[in-house]
UniProtKB/Swiss-Prot annotation:
Similarity remark: Belongs to the histidinol dehydrogenase family.
Residues forming the catalytic site: 334 (proton acceptor), 335 (proton acceptor)
PANTHER family on file: HISTIDINE BIOSYNTHESIS TRIFUNCTIONAL PROTEIN, HISTIDINOL DEHYDROGENASE HDH
Organism: Aromatoleum aromaticum (strain DSM 19018 / LMG 30748 / EbN1)
Protein name: Histidinol dehydrogenase
Keyword Oxidoreductase: yes
Binding site for Zn(2+): 266, 269, 368, 427
Single GO BP term: L-histidine biosynthetic process
InterPro entries linked to this entry: Ald_DH/histidinol_DH, Histidinol_DH_CS, Histidinol_DH_monofunct, Hstdl_DH
Length: 438
């Protein structure tokens, strides 16, 4: 079989039209798909109306599982343990090491309640409370990712979520033991073998068997993403993620083959994934391009990689690392690699990135699985205003207001003036009724 061509655009940041070309390269519109929109709308309506019956029907239709009740689609704790026990020693150890590292990192994120007391006895504070119940969607079939279980379940558990319910499709009854083992290791409370928009609907609205959750997290296909988008407001969601992204900043000090493979690691996700190199050394860019040509034929997913690099990839020559950092902040990538011998001084120049991987040894793939920080990161330039998934996404904050009698005298007058200025007389009088000299 002929290997696919490894075409990837070459750009020069000194060209007058560079920024316009870059913005066009970055532009990604998922686009409204009328077929997906209509299908998801009908599925949500059916599940909301009939509950278990609709979920069973869609599971029969899409996953080819013909069961009589939702009880048959729930896995027991013993089944999860059996999946864990079925793994090789190496697989079990890898899952445990990764889980431990993710847990240690996320334990540092746990927010605590606080308060303070003013001179007149007024107490103000913030109460931090974990969510009661969270739903975790995990893809099934060919796209089975135990790492997604670790990255979503562990921060929820660290936050103290009361109940964590996982849904994972099992087409034709095929279960992925790594995914179920990850659920066992992380302490997922309940697991249902359902998927698609019907699983999102069941989590969002509740059914006769599956209770309504407060928030839904986890990746999925276009139907899952659209369902999450539609149920937002009824429940919380983590994000609606776009294609995976990596941006590598290099001064030519690394190994070209390493950089090429790091670009591949994103490109193999799908044809819309984005892999970009910013480099000050034109000769090194040539070496990376040559490495891409040399290494691509050996990759099992070479067709996907080639299409991704051709569609949305770029090798960009920049004048300086200062310019590279400015461009990086414009891109606001999901993953940013500082592939530099002396990377530390440049961390402070980066304002917008989901995660920064510092130095030649900090390969992004380690962050996907076992470094510790979360791999659920903002995409599509949303790192300008959003953050990685973390413990804080599974906690909520409540303000505590305890006004003393003395405090009510001072604050009551302030509130009265402002309320009357807004034309809200009941607000003003409510405050004034607490005043001693009213």
């Amino acid at each position: 079989m002929t290997a696919p061509a490894a075409a990837i655009r070459r750009l020069d940041a000194r060209e007058p039209e560079f920024l316009a070309t870059l913005d066009a390269l970055l532009a990604f519109e998922g686009g409204a798909d009328a077929r997906i929109d209509a299908a998801v709308s009908e599925i949500l309506r059916a599940v909301r109306t009939t509950g278990d019956a609709a979920v069973l029907e869609y599971t029969r239709r899409f996953d080819h599982l013909d069961v009589k009740s939702m009880v048959q689609l729930e896995l027991s704790k013993s089944e999860l343990k059996a999946a864990l026990d079925s793994l090789t020693v190496e697989q079990r150890e890898a899952l445990r090491v990764a889980a431990d590292r993710v847990r240690v990192y996320h334990e540092r994120q746990r927010a605590e309640s606080w308060d303070y007391v003013e001179a007149d006895g007024t107490r103000l504070g913030q109460k931090v409370t974990p969510l009661d119940r969270v739903g975790l969607y995990v893809p099934g079939g060919r796209a089975s990712y135990p790492s997604s279980v670790l990255m979503n379940a562990i921060p929820a558990k660290v936050a103290g979520v009361g109940e964590l319910i996982m849904v994972v499709p099992t087409p034709n009854g095929e279960k992925n033991p790594l995914v179920l083992a990850a659920a066992a290791i992380t302490g997922v409370d309940r697991v249902f073998t359902i998927g698609g928009a019907q699983a999102v609907a069941a989590l969002a609205y509740g059914t006769q068997t599956l209770p309504q959750v407060d928030k839904i997290v986890g990746p999925g296909n276009a139907y899952v993403a659209e369902a999450k988008r539609r149920v937002f407001g009824t429940v919380g969601i983590d994000m609606v993620a776009g294609p995976s992204e990596v941006l590598i900043i290099s001064d030519g000090s690394g190994q070209a083959g390493w950089v090429a493979m790091d670009l591949f690691a994103q490109a193999e996700h799908d044809e819309l994934a984005q892999s970009i190199l910013l480099c000050t050394d034109a000769g090194f860019i040539d070496a990376v391009a040559a490495s891409i040509e040399r290494l691509l034929p050996s990759m099992p997913r070479r067709e996907t990689i080639a299409a991704s690099l051709a569609n949305r990839g770029a090798l960009i020559h920049v004048d300086s690392l200062e310019q590279a950092c400015a461009i990086a902040n414009r891109i606001a990538p999901e993953h940013l690699e500082l592939s530099l011998d002396d990377a530390e001084p440049w961390i402070g120049r980066i304002r917008h990135a989901g995660a920064i991987f510092v130095g030649h040894w900090s390969v992004e793939a380690l962050g996907d699985y076992c470094a510790g920080p979360n791999h659920v990161l903002p995409t599509m330039r949303s790192a300008r205003f959003s953050s990685p998934l973390g413990v804080y996404d599974f906690q909520k904050r409540t303000s505590i207001v305890q006004i003393s009698e003395a405090g009510a005298q001072t604050l009551g007058r302030v509130a009265s003036i402002l309320a009357r200025g807004e034309g809200l007389q009941a607000h003003a009088r409510s405050a004034e009724m607490r005043l001693h000299d009213r």
